[in-house]
A protein has these predicted regions:
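Flavin (primarily FAD) cofactor-binding/catalytic cores of flavoenzymes
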Residues: 2-13, 18-45, 75-410
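Redox-cofactor-proximal catalytic regions of oxidoreductases
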Residues: 40-64, 251
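A short small-residue
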Residues: 62-66, 378-380
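A short acidic, helix-capping loop that chelates divalent metal ions and anchors anionic groups
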Residues: 68-72
Length: 410
């Protein structure tokens, strides 16, 4: 098969790949971008219809390209984010080929570069940047395999309540996606059961300002990966309905039945761990800690942001928390659908180079792998907390582009 040659190959045409292309162009580095589907494909096909981005409009930006909006503190729907990325692609004008999937990445025979196998040949490159994003492979536990008549869908394939059969719905996973989907289903008149595991709950707004204003001003979003704590939990936040704090006690007061973690299932009966109270308490602790951090920052800098005592108000514990369910009979409860909001994992098995650890995660330092010339971009906590944010990928891309330039021009 024919082999094409380029200096640098970027795999992935989402926001990370486009930003990498922009940084390489700024440094005069010849490159090619490959995208297996369309630009921003996951935004187009793996988000539900009613999703509202949880980042405020003012924070949505890419290098040298601002997000157009009429309300900096508002939140945008998915179509607006897709158009923003499309417009950014037009601004960057990358050398991109869409509809080209890389099936294998391997070292070249001379070990001084790489070969990316594609359907009609291969591409040889001295440098490769893998920018395929952090949300690649939907994670779905195989707990309900003996219940084939039950409608089951991962959050990546969920679209709207009308997609589901009649009846109650069990949402497994109460992160940002699971919580927002559960609220949407409740508003649609569905009876909802929500399995809540370990989570980090933060206020949408506090002392008159959005969460992300505080993260930026305090510098929390710049926390380097070396200072990342042992907890690997993303905060549960929502941009729906103008943005609001996720409060699971409020969920229960509104009619959603909270459950602990699902541990097993047999013959349509689900076993539930006795950990709901602990999970809620841990989420509350993270919430209270953040309020304290903000209070200390305001005090230390003599800032004029009035105290917000309502932020510490707490609803009474609901019956589903004080007397939690330990088993759930799907048929008896009229549950006709299960939505797995259980997150995503990486899918890098096509990289046939010894750079992945036992969990399939790449070994790297701030995106620079231990294999000379092989890089990663757009992953969570690549170099800092905001590395996977739209507003954070540009700094990492610039660092990688500088490193690549050093290799090429040495």
């Amino acid at each position: 098969m024919p082999v094409e040659r380029v200096d640098t190959l970027v795999i992935g045409g989402g926001q990370a790949g486009l930003t990498m292309s922009h940084r390489l162009t700024q440094r005069g580095i010849a490159h090619l971008v490959l995208e297996r589907h369309r630009i921003a494909e996951r935004w187009r096909s793996e988000r539900w219809d009613g999703l509202t981005f949880q980042f405020p409009n003012w924070s949505v930006r890419l290098p040298e390209f601002a997000f157009p909006h009429g309300d900096p503190d508002g939140f945008s729907a998915v179509p607006a984010i897709v158009k923003f990325i499309e417009d950014y692609a037009a601004f960057v004008a990358p050398p991109i080929r869409c509809g080209v999937a890389v099936t294998r990445l391997r070292r070249s025979d001379d070990a001084d570069g790489f070969i990316a196998d594609i359907a009609d040949g291969g591409i040889a490159a001295r440098n490769v940047v893998v920018a395929t994003g952090p949300y690649q492979r939907p994670l779905r536990p195989d707990l309900l395999r003996d219940h084939p008549g039950l409608f089951q869908v991962h959050a990546s394939d969920y679209k709207n309540p009308a997609q589901l059969p009649d009846g109650a719905v069990l949402v497994i996973g109460a992160g940002a996606s699971g919580a927002q989907i559960a609220e949407e289903l409740r508003r649609a008149g569905r009876r909802v059961f929500l399995s809540v595991g370990r989570h980090s709950r933060l206020p949408r707004r506090y002392r008159g300002r959005d969460l992300f204003r505080w993260l930026a001003d305090i510098g929390i979003d710049q926390t380097p990966v070396e200072l990342r704590g042992p907890t690997r939990l993303l905060p549960v936040i929502s941009g729906a309905d103008g943005g609001h704090t996720i409060d699971f006690r409020r969920f229960a007061a509104d009619g959603i039945t909270l459950l602990g973690r699902i541990t097993a299932a047999r013959d349509g009966v689900i076993a539930i761990a006795p950990d709901l109270a602990e999970s809620i308490a841990n989420g509350d602790a993270a919430y209270a800690t953040f309020l304290g951090v903000v209070d200390d920052f305001v005090s230390a800098h003599s800032l004029d942001y009035p105290d917000d005592p309502t932020a510490r108000a707490q609803l009474p514990d609901p019956p589903c928390l004080t007397e939690p369910l330990h088993r759930l009979d799907l048929s008896a409860e009229g549950i006709g659908a299960v939505i797995w909001a259980t997150g995503y994992g990486l899918d890098l098995g096509w990289i046939e180079i010894p750079v992945l650890d036992a969990n399939g995660d790449p070994r790297h330092r701030r995106g620079i792998s231990e294999i000379p010339g092989l890089y990663f971009l757009g992953l969570q906590w690549l170099s800092k907390m905001k590395s996977s944010f739209l507003s954070g990928v540009g700094d990492d891309a610039a660092d990688l582009a500088d490193h690549i330039a050093g290799r090429l021009y040495a």
